[in-house]
Amino acid sequence: MFGLSKVLRVGEGRAVKRLHKIADQVIALEEKFANLTDEELKAKTAEFKERIAGGEGLDEIFLEAFATAREASWRVLGQKHYRVQIMGGAALHFGNVAEMRTGEGKTLTCVLPAYLNALEGKGVHVVTVNDYLAKRDAEMVGRVHRYLGLEVGVILSDMRPDERRKAYTADITYGTNNELGFDYLRDNMARSLSDLVQRGHNYAIVDEVDSILIDEARTPLIISGPVDGTSQFYNVFAQIVPRMTKDVHYEVDERKKTVGVKEEGVEYVEDQLGIDNLYAPEHSQLVSYLNNAIKAQELFTRDKDYIVRNGEVMIVDGFTGRVLAGRRYNEGMHQAIEAKERVEIKNENQTLATVTLQNYFRLYTKLAGMTGTAETEAAELNQIYKLDVIAIPTNRPNQREDLTDLVYKTQEAKFAAVVDDIAERTEKGQPVLVGTVSVERSEYLSQLLTKRGIKHNVLNAKHHEQEAQIVAQAGLPGAVTVATNMAGRGTDIVLGGNPEILLDIKLRERGLDPFEDEESYQEAWDAELPAMKQRCEERGDKVREAGGLYVLGTERHESRRIDNQLRGRSARQGDPGSTRFYLSMRDDLMVRFVGPTMENMMNRLNVPDDVPIESKTVTNSIKGAQAQVENQNFEMRKNVLKYDEVMNEQRKVIYSERREILESADISRYIQNMIEETVSAYVDGATANGYVEDWDLDKLWNALEALYDPSINWTDLVEGSEYGKPGELSAEDLRTALVNDAHAEYAKLEEAVSAIGGEAQIRNIERMVLMPVIDTKWREHLYEMDYLKEGIGLRAMAQRDPLVEYQKEGGDMFNGMKDGIKEETVRQLFLLRKQFIKQDAEVAD
């Protein structure tokens, strides 16, 4: 009726107009649904499900379902969707990215499309950036869905498989991208149907979609298993490298994140190890240990790229400042850092299963996302995920003032000015949010603020447990919050304090829980929310008089989008607010891209350290550098996707066949085909030369005897009356005779096992043999594909396209793996046949 599926294919301007019309129609239903009793409103869910069962599509119940969820939100949460939130919800339902400014209520927006799509009973996944937000949204926003009779589940990192399975059977499931992706991988390693937890990939709404689908897309999800033994050379090189000198023994390219060992370095290492030639074949692994030790020393910084917690090296997400729990660098890099930090070196890991987030999210039948800043990555979202980005208008005009960047010569001068600015702002009651690029910088600034006696909260990878409480109070008068990258934090900073979160904290402190005792929680919520809102509003008025939230960035990020996300925390919902970045010539981005030119100019002009400059040249240089880095990162992600596409097609084939085997009660046809194809391959290999005289029959017979005990007489087969003289025996005759013989021998195994445990027993044995073989061969294939990819770049030196070569050789390896699965499965099953024969012989004796 609206041409709904085409809403965003008509140009953004016309799309927004259509979304406005949809919002008008939903709002027009407001009075009708407000007049319904609680029972009548709740009954709408059953009515919609009946209509869907009767053949109506989601688009036909769309307006009424949105109106139902909107009214339920008002009754349960005391919040009614604004026009722009209805528009955002519609954009999400159509499978697009809704770009909504910070503070416009993305979490509430999500209620509408989640409810509508859950009515089909196929499951809706709402994807957040961390466990806390998944749990918070499932509890808080999930109250609306539970009120309407839907089940809401949440996936958390510490959950058992049975808890996960129950959560996935819910109508709406909240979880992080990592947990959903790892569950997908674990499901495809399961040995029985009872071990599966997910039930398919129908519709996903990804919150902070740019953070998840772009920032984290370069890092694949990997389930690993330890490789026996840890090399002593990690510690050896962790001691050697600190004694080496940068630019003398080795060189570092910080922009490309690469290192190179110079001749002097090679000689130094050879001397330290007491060897003659570091590059001799027997020492080939040592070069890898050396390079990783140099990278650990020069390119990986503690409290920026990783933290050490409880004797464990934990990776920090460079974009969000969060700890990536369970992630480890591969190819020995993590072990090199562990050696550098002198903590326990854990075994190297072998990949058991892997998928990139790019390919995981492309599994969904329908995908949608929300973010505050997506326009800079709109092309990438469309090109890779086929997602269109539509900018949803703000509910009120934006009043934010973005002040000019201030550039200082040194870091020390910059941070001194930052502290002065913070002190001045807090004195007049203005809250300040300070963005830093690393844990190290946030703690350094915290020390400076403490010395000045300025009270503040720190929000970084080390304190994420207190994140909600800190952010909920970041809008209080005079509050100072130091944050490591506010990207993906997921909680609004409300002037005067966030009443909903502050009340939730208060109720939980009293022992009330929205999951455990929803009725008591809701009763207290309804009674106390008005007073909490009034208290926060009164404090908010004071903050508005002081100028609103002031956002202060202490360094430019390499991505403009991350800078924009930080700025976007200010001036939400039409509030006043301002932002400013403080920079120094020693900042990472300035050192890498702006170079010494500007610093030399400042020195020539005798600019004092504590005097900043405001320069369009610097600002333009930064913008150019950011655009350059963004393009590099985009190319890297595209390249990752191109290579992973090869693995993805192979993964889909192997996982599909594996699932089919898992779900089949009888896999005997698979086994029969494997026997036929394996024996046929042996015959084809031996009879490749057309003439009988040239056949390698000895090789064929040896291979068959290694596979099973042929009952056919070889001499009779070749010279017997059935086929006449050797010259008259065709390869097809040979194949037919041997395949029939193998089938006959396998039938004896089936008969022997069935006599003991019935036919079901042999079918179970077939599955018990086949599944581990598939997993082992797939694991070996992943290792070989990794090895192939590492060296494939060298093909360019021979004027060959590395990607084409990777596709060709990877395809050949995959076919070889599939043949290996068949051969090994048949061999192991025939081993059982031999064991039965042996047992029968022992009984006879």
From Swiss-Prot:
InterPro entries, per database record: Helicase_ATP-bd, Helicase_C-like, P-loop_NTPase, SecA, SecA_CS, SecA_DEAD, SecA_motor_DEAD, SecA_preprotein_X-link_dom
Q: Which Gene3D superfamilies match?
A: Helical scaffold and wing domains of SecA (1.10.3060.10), P-loop containing nucleotide triphosphate hydrolases (3.40.50.300), SecA, preprotein cross-linking domain (3.90.1440.10)
Q: Name its cellular compartments.
A: Cell membrane; Cytoplasm
What is the E.C. number? 7.4.2.8
Q: Name one Pfam family in it.
A: SecA_SW
User: GO molecular function of the protein, one example?
Assistant: ATP binding
Write down any Gene Ontology CC term.
plasma membrane
Enzyme category, top tier:
translocase
**Membrane spanning residue stretches:** none
Q: Which GO terms describe its biological process?
A: intracellular protein transmembrane transport; protein import; protein targeting; protein transport by the Sec complex
Q: Does the keyword Metal-binding apply?
A: no
What is the protein's membrane topology class? Answer: Peripheral membrane protein
* SUPFAM superfamilies hit by this protein: Helical scaffold and wing domains of SecA, P-loop containing nucleoside triphosphate hydrolases, Pre-protein crosslinking domain of SecA
Point out the coiled-coil segments of this chain: none
Keywords, ordered alphabetically: ATP-binding, Cell membrane, Cytoplasm, Membrane, Nucleotide-binding, Protein transport, Translocase, Translocation, Transport
Q: Which PANTHER family match?
A: CHLOROPLAST PROTEIN-TRANSPORTING ATPASE (PTHR30612:SF0), SECA INNER MEMBRANE COMPONENT OF SEC PROTEIN SECRETION SYSTEM (PTHR30612)
The UniProt family comment states: Belongs to the SecA family.
NCBIfam families reported for this sequence: PRK12904.1, secA
Q: How does it assemble?
A: Monomer and homodimer. Part of the essential Sec protein translocation apparatus which comprises SecA, SecYEG and auxiliary proteins SecDF. Other proteins may also be involved.
HAMAP family registered for this protein in UniProt = SecA (MF_01382)
Function recorded in the entry: Part of the Sec protein translocase complex. Interacts with the SecYEG preprotein conducting channel. Has a central role in coupling the hydrolysis of ATP to the transfer of proteins into and across the cell membrane, serving as an ATP-driven molecular motor driving the stepwise translocation of polypeptide chains across the membrane.
Name of the protein in its database record: Protein translocase subunit SecA 1
| Gene it is expressed from | secA1
